[in-house]
Amino acid sequence: MTDYNVSRLLQELQATNPERYELVQAVRQAIYSVVPDAEERVMYGGFMFSGEAQFCGVFAYREHVSVEFGRGCDLDDPHGVLEGSGKLRRHIRL
């Protein structure tokens, strides 16, 4: 069952930016296809996903959607798609 705050944010996004809404929905579906029992909640203005710990967030901006990884520094990135130069966090712009 989808959390009320998740549903509300999705409705708001669909009303204000349908293109970003479709992209966010595709990313959410991809996440659930890999981690079907992931928990999702609204945090920091986006969608945060967790299992035993938080593993990513999906954020819709005016010009793009960002998939952010709190420990992205630990991810293999053979194709160089991760952005960010901080100590831990990395993101992908879509």
Predicted regions and their residues:
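Charge-dense, helix-prone N-terminal extensions
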Residues: 1-93
